[in-house]
């Protein structure tokens, strides 16, 4: 799991010093308020550094509650989606859009091309269960089926596998 933490600085000063602390996500609100001396709902703090896979979603005035929500959404993604998160963002608008669609995305982690996906679908799809092993091995045209899938489906090919995306 990738490290998720932020450096938060108070807008107020205690004496001459501005207070800042690193917090691991999800942030415990009571600990946050105790360490910084400001309410989690206040505008008296800002995020000055971040180590997050979803860093583009977070800006200086993102609230603790929003940070925790982003962290929750990211952690709900399967490991393959987390690993390929930057590539998935080329298709999805943001983390929330990916999170909403996460259960309808099919991951083919061991597939390097569409023929591999065609083979995987043949093995796992109940539509093909009536085909004999001989038929599957000797007569099934995987290249044609792969072309059909690519033409009529939506797929994202990555370094670590292929994702079948919703239309």
State each model region's role.
Residues 14, 29-33, 53, 146, ...:
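A generic structural micro-environment signature
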Residues 9-15, 52, 159-160, 166-167:
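Short, flexible beta-strand-to-coil junctions
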């Amino acid at each position: 799991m990738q490290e998720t933490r932020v450096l938060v600085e108070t807008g107020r000063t205690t004496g001459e010093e501005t207070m800042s602390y690193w917090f691991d996500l999800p942030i415990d609100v009571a600990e946050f308020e105790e360490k910084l001396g400001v309410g989690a709902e206040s505008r008296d703090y800002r995020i000055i550094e971040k180590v997050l896979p979803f860093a583009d979603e977070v800006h200086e005035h993102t609230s603790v509650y929003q940070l925790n929500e982003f962290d929750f959404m990211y952690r709900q993604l399967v490991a393959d989606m987390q690993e390929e998160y930057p590539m998935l963002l080329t298709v999805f608008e943001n983390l929330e859009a990916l999170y909403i669609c996460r259960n309808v995305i099919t991951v083919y982690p061991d597939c390097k091309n569409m023929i591999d996906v065609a083979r995987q679908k043949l093995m796992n799809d109940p539509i093909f269960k009536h085909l004999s092993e001989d038929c599957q091995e000797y007569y099934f045209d995987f290249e044609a089926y792969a072309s059909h899938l690519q033409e009529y489906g939506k797929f994202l090919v990555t370094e670590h596998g292929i994702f079948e995306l919703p239309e």
